[in-house]
Amino acid sequence: MIPMTYLFVLCPLLFAAVAWGIKNRLRPLVLLAAALIHLLSTLWVTVTPQSPADGGWLWLDPLGRIVLFCISVLFTICAFYAVGYLRYYNKRSNRFLCVCMLVCLSAMTLVSMAQHLGLFWVAMETTTLTMAPLIYFYRNARSIEATWNYIIICSVGIALAFLGLMFLSYSTHLAH
């Protein structure tokens, strides 16, 4: 049986796969359904005790529960807004927007549950990189410039975070 923590990460990815394959007008509803299921699951897991042995590298500590709750509430608000916005702005396909938002939800969930620094870093950088297509949604000169600026600035952050992770890993090996 798959632990609940893994389902939290996999569920938005499954919704992203569904959103990839369906029509434009239905994608915002998939986004909203994923948000509501994630929020209800988050509320359930917030009140249910979980021991660290249940998940290994993935489990929710008390701080992770608070972070996951905040992520889920904010994503649900964004999903409600996206339904109306994407119905109004229907000139372009919303495939990348919906799929990237769901992949980002999955990665943010993984960030709140990761108990391994390497996994935490990968999840954090996945959230960063899945935001780039969202910045480029309008597909004009200003959005491409903003996307490139975002990627360049975030690449520096990714490199510094990785360097810090290496220093932290090295220092923990020296301590043992």
Label every model-predicted segment.
Residues 1-100:
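Transmembrane helix-loop-helix hairpins at membrane boundaries of multipass inner-membrane proteins
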Residues 72-75, 105-109:
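Generic beta-strand or strand-like secondary-structure segments
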Residues 96-103, 109-176:
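Alpha-helical multi-pass transmembrane bundles of energy-transducing inner-membrane proteins
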